[in-house]
A protein has these predicted regions:
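Flexible "arm" and connector segments at domain edges
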Residues: 1-74, 78-124
């Protein structure tokens, strides 16, 4: 599935940074436009699955051409995440670690295992 080779996040962020700088795109990458880009690309990923049944989606995930399309859309989403973090000095590793800690408290495994409820639905 994956090559177990570790990918350094900083290296990917730098590749995105240089890609954009080579094209003089910093001027277009304010927080609003980066958020719009992220949302747009996320919706392009979502559109692949629109009006599909569970069975159809499972079949799609077996098709190489469809998997390639999905991979490209995921890469577009990841690009905007990395670019936003790079432009506005957000430490993604710390942000994710902190968020996982918060979610671990909101969604303790012993309470939510096998359930997909929002934390407000099982508190109390």
């Amino acid at each position: 599935m994956y090559d177990k080779q570790e990918v350094e996040l900083d290296g990917l962020i730098n590749r995105v940074k240089f890609f954009c700088e080579d094209r003089d795109w910093d001027q277009y990458h304010n927080p609003k436009d980066l958020a719009i880009g992220l949302s747009t690309e996320s919706n392009e990923l979502l559109d692949i699955f629109r009006f599909k049944s569970e069975a159809q989606m499972q079949e799609m995930m077996k098709e190489e051409k469809c998997r390639e399309h999905i991979s490209e859309e995921l890469a577009d989403v990841f690009f905007f995440v990395l670019r936003f973090a790079q432009m506005y000095e957000i430490d993604l590793e710390k942000a994710l670690t902190d968020k996982l800690e918060k979610n671990n408290k909101k969604y303790p495994a012993e309470k939510v295992r096998g359930r997909n409820l929002k934390y407000t639905e099982y508190e109390g």
